[in-house]
C-alpha cells in the first residue's frame, strides 16, 4: 500500500511541530521560557528508551555514570581560555541568591569539561588508575540567539549525554575517540539512523580540542543535522588546571582527555527519519508501545463481549512475553478513529481482533510502516510478532539509508554543489586542497556550512577554489 509522504517531505518543519504536539510527545512553545519544551509522558518514554540504549552501550565499554552539579563557578569555567572564548556568548549566568548579589557568578552548565577535569584531578593521581571513563545524562544550557526549534536548537538541552575520559598518552586518547565513534555508530545503526562520519575543519572544531570527529545525518527537508561529536582534548584542560598524574617511572605528566556527546537531536531524528503523512514510524527498540490491540465490535453485544475477552487474552500473552503492548478498549471511538490515533503515535504494529479472529483463534497484525497485514495463529503470535518487528526494523533502516545515499552527491564545481543544495538539499562533496582559506571561501560562496572531511583522505580532482590538486573532499550542507 502506497502511503503519502508529501507533507513530511515538502513541509517538514510544520509536520514535525504537528507530530510532537498531536502525538503528545513534546509540548513546545507554551512553557513561558523561550527555547524550552516539556517532555510529555509518551515522549518521555521514547526518551527513556533512547537513553537506556546508550547507557547499555557505554556501560558495556567500561564507562561509569556520574552526576555533576548544574552550577559552575565563573573562575572555574574560565580556567581554559580557548574553551570559554568559544562558549562565553552562550552562557547563562546566575548572579543573585534571593535578593543578594553573589560575590561570584555561577554558570548554568553549558558543558562540563572544566568541572570534570577538576574532580578528575582529585580522584586520579597515577598511571595505574588510567584510563578512566565517565559519563552523565543531564540538562545543559546554551543562550541560543538564533531562531529556536524544538529538540533541534533549544536553550535547554534536557537529554545531553556527555562522556569524559582521561588517559596517560595522546595515542591512548586518540584510540578512545575511535571507540566513541564506534559506540555512536552502533547506537545509530540500532536506531536506524543513517550518518556520515567527518573530521571537522580546524575553524569549526570544539573550543579547546585538538580535533573533532562528528556524525551528521540528513533531515527530510534536506538540511544536515549534527547528531554526535567526539573531541580529542589533548592536554588543553589539564595544563590549564595544572593537573598531573604520576607515570610508571615516577615522573609526572599532564594527562590527555577526550569528551563526546549526543543530545535531544537524536530523538528528533528518530521521530523524523522514517515518518509519513500519518505521523512518525518509531523503530520497535524505542517505541513506548510496540503493539496496540484494537478490538472490532461484533454484530451483537454478546459477540463484542467475547471479542473484548479474547483481546484481553491476547494482551496477556504478549505482555507475559515481555512485549510492550496496549489494549485500546475505549468505547467512545470507532476502530477507524483508534487506527488514526495510534498511527499518529508511530506504534510499529497494530493487532486487530474482530469476529473473524475470534472464530478462527487468530490475530491480524498490521505494520505501521507499510500498512500491510497478515493473519497469524494465536499459538504463533509471539514468534510472528517478534519476526515482524525484526523485519520492520530492517526495512526502516534500509529505507533510511537509501534515502540518505540519494542525498549525498559529489561535484567538481562550486556552482553545481550550490545548485544541488538549493534545489534538493543534502550533503555535497567537492575537491579541496586542505587550506583553511579555501575552505572558508567554499562556505562563503555556497552559503552553506562545511561539515568536514572523510576520516580517510579521498583526493578527487582539483580544489574547486584555487585549482591545486586536492588532498581530500570537503563536505558541505545547509544546517540548522
From Swiss-Prot:
What EC identifiers does the entry list?
6.1.1.15
Q: State if RNA-binding is listed as a keyword.
A: no
What is its EC class? ligase
Q: Pull one GO CC term from this UniProt entry.
A: aminoacyl-tRNA synthetase multienzyme complex
List UniProt keywords, sorted A-Z: Aminoacyl-tRNA synthetase, ATP-binding, Cytoplasm, Ligase, Nucleotide-binding, Protein biosynthesis
Cite the CDD domains for this sequence: ProRS_anticodon_zinc, ProRS_core_arch_euk
Q: How does it assemble?
A: Homodimer.
Domain note: Consists of three domains: the N-terminal catalytic domain, the anticodon-binding domain and the C-terminal extension.
Q: What does this protein do?
A: Catalyzes the attachment of proline to tRNA(Pro) in a two-step reaction: proline is first activated by ATP to form Pro-AMP and then transferred to the acceptor end of tRNA(Pro).
Protein name (record): Proline--tRNA ligase
Q: Please name the source species.
A: Metallosphaera sedula (strain ATCC 51363 / DSM 5348 / JCM 9185 / NBRC 15509 / TH2)
Which gene codes for it?
A: proS
Amino acid at each position: 500500500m502506497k502511503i503519502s509522504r508529501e507533507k513530511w517531505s515538502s513541509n517538514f518543519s510544520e509536520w514535525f511541530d504537528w507530530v510532537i504536539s498531536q502525538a503528545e510527545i513534546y509540548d513546545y512553545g507554551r512553557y513561558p521560557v523561550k527555547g524550552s519544551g516539556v517532555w510529555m509522558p509518551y515522549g518521555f518514554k521514547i526518551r527513556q528508551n533512547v537513553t537506556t540504549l546508550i547507557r547499555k552501550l557505554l556501560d558495556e565499554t567500561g564507562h561509569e555514570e556520574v552526576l555533576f552539579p548544574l552550577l559552575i563557578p565563573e573562575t572555574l569555567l574560565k580556567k581554559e581560555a580557548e574553551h570559554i572564548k568559544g562558549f562565553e556568548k552562550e552562557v547563562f549566568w546566575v548572579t543573585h541568591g534571593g535578593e543578594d548579589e553573589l560575590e561570584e557568578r555561577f554558570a548554568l552548565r553549558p558543558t562540563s569539561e572544566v568541572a570534570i577535569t577538576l574532580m578528575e584531578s582529585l580522584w586520579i593521581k597515577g598511571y595505574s588508575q588510567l584510563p578512566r571513563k565517565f559519563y552523565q545524562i543531564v540538562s545543559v544550557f546554551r543562550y541560543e540567539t538564533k531562531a529556536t526549534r524544538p529538540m533541534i536548537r533549544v536553550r535547554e538541552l534536557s537529554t545531553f549525554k556527555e562522556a569524559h575520559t582521561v588517559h596517560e598518552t595522546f595515542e591512548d586518547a586518540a584510540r578512545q575517540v575511535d571507540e566513541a565513534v564506534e559506540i555512536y555508530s552502533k547506537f545509530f545503526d540500532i536506531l536506524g539512523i543513517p550518518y556520515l562520519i567527518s573530521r571537522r575543519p580546524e575553524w569549526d572544531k570544539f573550543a579547546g580540542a585538538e580535533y573533532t570527529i562528528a556524525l551528521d545525518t540528513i533531515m527530510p527537508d534536506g538540511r544536515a543535522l549534527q547528531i554526535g561529536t567526539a573531541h580529542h582534548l589533548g592536554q588543553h584542560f589539564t595544563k590549564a588546571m595544572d593537573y598531573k598524574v604520576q607515570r610508571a617511572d615516577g615522573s609526572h605528566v599532564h594527562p590527555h582527555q577526550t569528551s563526546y556527546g549526543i543530545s535531544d537531536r537524536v530523538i528528533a531524528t528518530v521521530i523524523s527519519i522514517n515518518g509519513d503523512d500519518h505521523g512518525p514510524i518509531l523503530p520497535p527498540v524505542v517505541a513506548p508501545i510496540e503493539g496496540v490491540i484494537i478490538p472490532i465490535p461484533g454484530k451483537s453485544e454478546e459477540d463484542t463481549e467475547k471479542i473484548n475477552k479474547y483481546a484481553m487474552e491476547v494482551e496477556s500473552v504478549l505482555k507475559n512475553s515481555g512485549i510492550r503492548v496496549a489494549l485500546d478498549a475505549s468505547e467512545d471511538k470507532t476502530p477507524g478513529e483508534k487506527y488514526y490515533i495510534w498511527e499518529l503515535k508511530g506504534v510499529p504494529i497494530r493487532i486487530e481482533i474482530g469476529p473473524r479472529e475470534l472464530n478462527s483463534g487468530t490475530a491480524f497484525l498490521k505494520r505501521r510502516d507499510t500498512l500491510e497485514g497478515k493473519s497469524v495463529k494465536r499459538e504463533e503470535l509471539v514468534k510472528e510478532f517478534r519476526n515482524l518487528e525484526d523485519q520492520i526494523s530492517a526495512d526502516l533502516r534500509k529505507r533510511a539509508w537509501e534515502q540518505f545515499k540519494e542525498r549525498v552527491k559529489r561535484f567538481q564545481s562550486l556552482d553545481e554543489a550550490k545548485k544541488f543544495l538549493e534545489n534538493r538539499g543534502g550533503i555535497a562533496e567537492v575537491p579541496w586542497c586542505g587550506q583553511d582559506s579555501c575552505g572558508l571561501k567554499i562556505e562563503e560562496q555556497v552559503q552553506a556550512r562545511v561539515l568536514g572531511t572523510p576520516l580517510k583522505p579521498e583526493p578527487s580532482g582539483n580544489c574547486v577554489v584555487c585549482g591545486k590538486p586536492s588532498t581530500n573532499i570537503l563536505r558541505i550542507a545547509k544546517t540548522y
